[in-house]
């Protein structure tokens, strides 16, 4: 079974847009076979709340909505005009406020009929609330259908999803949090994961380390799946007929962000993590101020987003040169060449053919030029930050500590006292703290003094110092690798054309396998391994009293979920795992939210402040 999460989410959305009818001419209702059905279908209105707008945006664009008969897409929280002759498709989270708005819309007769779709299972109490309200207004006849869609997750691409649950790390690690709030968040995470596996149509085998949020979420999800599987038929009935052996079912690996803190903080040198960290990529969209989409419709992004930044610059330069060459060829075919050989005035058919070929190539050339310009602008913007903040130096220093376990004290102190934002310096200092089991006291004092000199809020640093001893995993990977010198970006590159970047040597990022990747690889193999032998196992299909030892693997497919925030660095590491595997493996990566280093260090700072640690001080400690 292939884990085609994005495709299956898209299929569900398209069926919903077609009023939950199975489309003719296309097995999945998404391909080109739906054209005639769409042309004959009456137009409709799509009404969503903001969270559902966010989950829809990465999988369907406005033009694609029109293909499926949607002429207007509106936010339920904003004023809307009456369209009494059109059916309305609602996609909403099941909340009391949303139910009340639907009831008010029905009472006002805004639309001809109401096809209500909830992103998760709607509680019975809310259904009764809706029924009572529509009955009181005599508008119940307008409600044509109520459906649970189990779509409450954002699928950014085929192998990456987010539950869009902000600040989960803070909520789960705040010592002052009420037990009821923790339980509610754990249940919400479990419900989001239930939506993911329900969309896939597969009941997973769940593995996690004992204790902490991962075990709490695993237990809640196991209970929810067991309750659902009691009913026949259910969302997994079809999958159950084929997934009879453990290797035919996916593995769901749950991790707590504290399992490896450093990867959420460190700087990276690859194109995609840089764009996310430095330029603020969100939901596959970027604003520079130009607005760009960076997703699987962009062939350059798909092919090069995991390359190191200098390699990306080389590829931009190569594609620009190829584009210019192709433009010159078109000019020659249309008589624009210097010798005009193609058009000698005697071969009308040949000349016409050349002209038609040239004209047909123009749209493709135009799109290529747009793509090249887009990535040139992005790379130029990145280069400005690299120069102004010495980001290459931060990456090299952090990489040396995390991968080699070596410390260049001079470089560390120069960075802490030199270029870079306060967040850059704080991330470097926390990475230093996490890289060594027992930092040298004099080094630690110098690091703290440098942070104070730069007036950096010490809350996150002090918070990590406090919790570090609770988890030996924090030390990070200890793999060794050779070093490489780095050129001075500030003096040699900034202010030059994009071609100036192509000669830069790539910075070392090999040799380090992240802790989550090592654990996932061991869990998928299913062999005895001291790193994961003590992991808990939950199998919702097995009797609670029975042993589930036979379900320990091997597994070909896995869903890896990070509770408290994921990132593109971890996603890349898991992608590389599947690429180097001798057997075919597939891994989907998800998290409560996708965070860059600044966003995560801010959550650590918030926890430090809640604990009364750190703060900003410009004074040096007493000598």
From Swiss-Prot:
Question: Superkingdom, according to UniProt?
Answer: Eukaryota
Q: What does this protein do?
A: May be involved in the early secretory pathway.
Specify the taxonomic lineage.
Answer: Eukaryota, Viridiplantae, Streptophyta, Embryophyta, Tracheophyta
Protein name from the UniProt record: SEC1 family transport protein SLY1
Organism equals Oryza sativa subsp. japonica (Rice)
Extract the InterPro entries matched here: Sec-1-like_dom1 (IPR043154), Sec-1-like_dom3a (IPR043127), Sec1-like (IPR001619), Sec1-like_dom2 (IPR027482), Sec1-like_sf (IPR036045)
Taken from the UniProt entry, a GO cellular component term is: Golgi membrane
| Gene Ontology annotations of biological process type | endoplasmic reticulum to Golgi vesicle-mediated transport; intracellular protein transport; retrograde vesicle-mediated transport, Golgi to endoplasmic reticulum
Q: Which UniProt keywords apply?
A: Protein transport, Transport
Residue stretches in coiled coil: none
- What GO terms are given for molecular function? syntaxin binding
To which protein family does this belong? Belongs to the STXBP/unc-18/SEC1 family.
């Amino acid at each position: 079974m292939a884990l085609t999460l994005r495709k299956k989410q898209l299929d569900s959305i398209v069926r919903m847009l077609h009023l939950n009818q199975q489309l003719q001419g296309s097995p999945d209702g998404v391909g080109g076979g739906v054209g005639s059905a769409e042309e004959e279908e009456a137009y409709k209105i799509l009404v969503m709340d903001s969270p559902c707008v966010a989950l829809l945006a990465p999988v369907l664009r406005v033009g694609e909505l029109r293909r499926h008969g949607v002429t207007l897409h509106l936010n339920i929280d904003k004023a809307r005009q009456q369209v009494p002759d059109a059916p309305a498709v609602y996609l909403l989270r099941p909340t009391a406020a949303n139910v009340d708005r639907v009831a008010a819309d029905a009472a006002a007769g805004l639309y001809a009929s109401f096809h209500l779709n909830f992103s998760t299972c709607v509680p019975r109490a809310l259904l009764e609330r809706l029924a009572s309200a529509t009955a009181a207004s005599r508008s119940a006849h307008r409600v044509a259908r109520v459906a649970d869609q189990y779509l409450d997750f954002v699928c950014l691409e085929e192998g990456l999803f987010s539950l869009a649950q902000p600040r989960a790390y803070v909520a789960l690690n705040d010592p002052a949090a009420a037990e009821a709030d923790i339980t509610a968040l754990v249940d919400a995470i479990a419900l989001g994961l239930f939506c993911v596996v329900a969309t896939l149509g597969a009941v997973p085998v769940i593995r996690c380390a004992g204790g902490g949020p991962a075990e709490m979420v695993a237990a809640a999800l196991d209970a929810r799946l067991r309750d659902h599987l009691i009913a026949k038929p259910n969302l997994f009935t079809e999958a159950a007929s084929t997934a009879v052996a453990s290797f035919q079912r996916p593995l769901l690996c749950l991790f707590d962000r504290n399992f490896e803190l450093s990867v959420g903080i460190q700087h990276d040198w690859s194109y995609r993590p840089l764009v996310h960290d430095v330029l603020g990529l969100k939901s596959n969209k970027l604003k520079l101020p130009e607005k760009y989409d960076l997703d699987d419709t962009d062939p350059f992004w798909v092919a090069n987003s995991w390359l190191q930044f200098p390699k990306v610059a080389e590829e931009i330069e190569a594609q620009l040169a190829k584009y210019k060459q192709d433009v010159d060829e078109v000019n020659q075919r249309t008589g624009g060449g210097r010798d005009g050989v193609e058009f000698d005035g005697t071969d009308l058919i040949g000349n016409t053919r050349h002209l038609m070929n040239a004209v047909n190539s123009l749209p493709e050339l135009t799109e290529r030029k747009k793509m090249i310009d887009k990535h040139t602008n992005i790379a130029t913007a990145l280069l400005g930050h690299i120069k102004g903040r010495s980001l290459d130096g931060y990456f090299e220093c952090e990489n040396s500590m995390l991968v080699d376990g070596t410390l260049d004290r001079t470089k560390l102190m120069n960075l802490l006292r030199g270029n870079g934002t306060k967040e850059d310096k704080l991330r470097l200092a926390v990475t230093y703290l996490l890289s060594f089991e027992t930092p040298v006291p004099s080094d630690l004092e110098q690091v703290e003094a440098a942070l104070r000199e730069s007036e950096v809020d010490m809350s996150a640093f002090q918070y990590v110092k406090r919790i570090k001893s609770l988890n030996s995993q924090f030390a990070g990977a200890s793999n060794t690798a050779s070093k490489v010198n780095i050129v001075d970006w500030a003096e040699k590159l900034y202010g030059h054309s994009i071609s100036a970047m192509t000669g830069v040597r790539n910075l070392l990022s090999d040799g380090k396998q992240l802790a989550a990747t090592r654990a996932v690889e061991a869990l998928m193999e299913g062999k005895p391994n001291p790193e994961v032998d003590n992991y808990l196992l939950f199998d919702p299909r097995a009797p609670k009293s029975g042993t589930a030892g036979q379900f320990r693997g091997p597994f070909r497919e896995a869903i890896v979920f990070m509770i408290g925030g994921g990132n593109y660095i971890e996603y890349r590491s898991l992608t590389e795992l599947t690429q180097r595997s001798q057997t075919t493996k597939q891994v989907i990566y998800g998290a409560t939210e996708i965070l860059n280093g600044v966003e995560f260090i801010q959550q650590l700072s918030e926890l430090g402040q809640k604990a009364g640690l750190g703060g900003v001080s410009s004074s040096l400690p007493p000598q």
